[in-house]
Curated annotation (Swiss-Prot):
This is Large ribosomal subunit protein uL18. It comes from Kosmotoga olearia (strain ATCC BAA-1733 / DSM 21960 / TBF 19.5.1). Coiled coil: none annotated. Belongs to the universal ribosomal protein uL18 family. One of its GO terms (molecular function) is 5S rRNA binding. One of its GO terms (cellular component) is cytosolic large ribosomal subunit.
Length: 122
């Protein structure tokens, strides 16, 4: 059985490996996703300028009022819709998806699918 500490270390290694290949540009910024046990966070980042353009998470006041649970796939879908809406307001349509070393299933996949349905292309 893999210990929690080892799992986190393996995820960090996967994330570093992916980050060495993926860069966000002003034309195609990076959608970075982080998943904790209770919440899910998403940011659209321009790596060249080194700044976050838009962000959304289950901690946002806008979503906290709507959600009963913040750690399920429904919450991840809401975050995906919200990040896509905020990106559209800033004129962002195409992005590069950075899963942050997490497996592409469950909450990460739900967030990505909801963002695609709401208009982001990746």
């Amino acid at each position: 059985m893999i210990k929690r500490r080892d799992r986190k270390e393996l995820r960090r290694k996967r994330h570093l490996r992916v980050r060495s290949k993926i860069k966000g540009t002003p034309e195609r910024p990076r959608l970075a996703v982080y998943r904790s046990e209770r919440h899910i966070y998403a940011q659209i980042i321009d790596d060249i300028a080194g700044r976050t353009i838009v962000s959304a998470s289950t901690v946002d006041k806008e979503l906290r009022e709507k959600l009963t649970k913040t750690w399920n796939q429904e919450a991840a879908k809401e975050v995906g819709k919200l990040i896509a809406k905020r990106a559209a307001e800033k004129g962002i349509k195409k992005i590069v998806f950075d899963r942050g070393g997490f497996k592409f299933h469950g909450r990460i996949k739900s967030l990505a699918d909801a963002a695609r349905e709401a208009g982001l292309e990746f």
